[in-house]
From Swiss-Prot:
An example Gene Ontology biological process: proton motive force-driven plasma membrane ATP synthesis
Skewed-composition ranges (Basic and acidic residues): 190-201
Protein name: ATP synthase gamma chain 2
Origin: domain of life: Bacteria
Protein purpose: Produces ATP from ADP in the presence of a proton gradient across the membrane. The gamma chain is believed to be important in regulating ATPase activity and the flow of protons through the CF(0) complex.
Alphabetized Gene3D superfamilies for the sequence: 3.40.1380.10, ATP synthase, gamma subunit, helix hairpin domain (1.10.287.80)
Organism lineage: Bacteria, Pseudomonadati, Pseudomonadota, Gammaproteobacteria, Vibrionales
Principal location class: membrane
Membrane topology: Peripheral membrane protein
Alphabetized UniProt keyword annotations: ATP synthesis, Cell inner membrane, Cell membrane, CF(1), Hydrogen ion transport, Ion transport, Membrane, Transport
Gene name per UniProt: atpG2
Family: Belongs to the ATPase gamma chain family.
PANTHER family per record: ATP SYNTHASE GAMMA CHAIN, ATP SYNTHASE SUBUNIT GAMMA, MITOCHONDRIAL
Molecular function GO terms recorded: ATP binding; proton-transporting ATP synthase activity, rotational mechanism
Length: 291
């Protein structure tokens, strides 16, 4: 058993760590509320853009946009969004496992994989996987669309040139403070059925015809670009909200665990102190009897 002094030193060390994790928990909680507000403000736009594109894709089009045309997958690409910092539990590792599983399915079919990485953790993990076309990090808690345009544009150029035939978005979807789901959605070509919609095949609203003015090509070109930008931006905002929620939960767990360790060490310290006092008393009594 360690002596009382060593135990006191360890208790003080754990208490200092507990103060740090408690402070980080409060900071993460404060940031989470702010990023949740940002996420809630942008989510309706992203969802409505997805619905509009789904309706357009299912309608009778005068002009068939290349982003809506299915083609044989010879090479696929992923935009993977992670956090810039750690200490957020298994948030990033769960996302990376999901992405790797999906990537391996394509590789087993002899389909090459390209990557665009957003976030320092994704960059450090995936730099040895596949061909990295673009990467960016350091977006902060309130990212700007301009910071993402370079990565998005690089992927769209590859799709336009026929260098890739599928484009997927990989990110963490914010459900609530305790639940964050790793998600993979197909961006290009836009799937015939929107993954987020539970529309019935015979629904009268599932197929709409549009009249485009002045020109369907110009309108669809602009609309499809805004659609891709909105989905990538929303995925980034969702991932940031997930990061802060996961960090808050992880730091709370660490703080609670530190408290349990301190209690256990306090019991060990009390036993060690009791043993030392008992030994001293025994020595005093033995000395008195000898006299």
């Amino acid at each position: 058993m360690a002596n009382a002094k060593e135990i006191r030193t360890k208790i003080a060390s754990v208490q200092n760590t507990q103060k740090i994790t408690s402070a980080m928990e409060m900071v993460a909680a404060s940031k989470m509320r702010k990023v949740q507000d940002n996420m809630a403000a942008t989510r309706p736009y992203a969802e409505n853009m997805r619905k509009v594109i789904s309706h357009v894709a299912s309608g009778s089009l005068e002009y068939k946009h290349p982003y809506l045309e299915e083609r044989e997958a010879k090479r696929v690409a992923y935009i993977i969004i992670s956090s810039d910092r750690g200490l957020c539990g298994g948030l990033n590792s769960n996302l990376f496992k999901r992405a790797l599983t999906d990537m391996r399915q394509w590789q087993e079919k002899n389909v090459e994989v390209d990557l665009t990485l957003i976030g320092s953790k994704a960059i450090s993990f995936f730099h040895r996987f596949g061909n990295v076309i673009a990467q960016t990090s350091g977006l902060g808690d309130k990212p700007k669309l301009e910071d993402l345009l370079g990565a998005v544009t690089a992927m769209l150029e590859h799709f336009d040139d026929g260098k890739i035939d599928r484009l997927y978005l990989v990110y963490n979807e914010f459900v609530n403070t305790m639940v964050q789901n790793p998600r993979i959605t197909q961006l290009l070509p836009h799937p015939d059925k929107d993954e987020s919609q539970d529309s019935k095949p015979n629904d009268a609203t599932s197929r709409w015809d549009y009249i485009y003015e002045p020109d369907p090509k110009d309108i669809l070109n602009a609309l499809m670009l805004r659609y891709i930008e909105s989905q990538v931006y929303q995925g980034t905002v969702e991932s940031i909200a997930c990061e802060q929620a996961a960090r808050m939960v992880a730091m709370k767990s660490a703080t609670d665990n530190a408290g349990d360790i301190i209690n256990d060490l306090q019991l060990v310290y009390n036993k060690a102190r009791q043993s030392a006092i008992t030994q001293e008393l025994s020595e005093i009594v033995a000395g008195a009897q000898a006299v």
